[in-house]
Amino acid sequence: MVEGSYACGNSQKPLIGITIGEMLNRIAAAHPDSDALISVHQNIRWTYAEFLERVNTLARALMALDVERGDRVAIWALNYAEWVLVQFATAKIGAIMVNINPAYRTYEFEY
């Protein structure tokens, strides 16, 4: 017997209707001094204001490299704060982050 591969929750609640980037802007404006990201192993603690500034800086840098809406940006990284920056920066410009398994060997990545 084949069963569905997804779960369907309450469909009566409407979608938010804003982008991830806009949601980050709103949260950072409302709670600029609250913790947004903590990476203990990197000794990093960024507030929403700091996080938003870093995300916007990275988004501008990606756009300067001609990354635009719909483009794919691959990241081959371990669990670091910068991974989260890439996720939000690509979302802000409408690009798609492609996560490459950091356990891949070079020859697997080349394939």
Predicted segments — roles?
Residues 100-102:
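Short beta->alpha connector loops at strand-helix junctions that form conserved
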Residues 91:
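Anion (oxyanion) recognition and catalysis
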Residues 1-18:
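Flexible, non-catalytic linker and terminal segments flanking ANL/adenylate-forming cores
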Residues 16, 33-88, 105-111:
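Conserved AMP-binding/adenylate-forming core of the ANL superfamily
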Residues 19, 23-24, 108:
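Hydrophobic alpha-helical segments typical of transmembrane helices
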Residues 94:
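Structured binding elements
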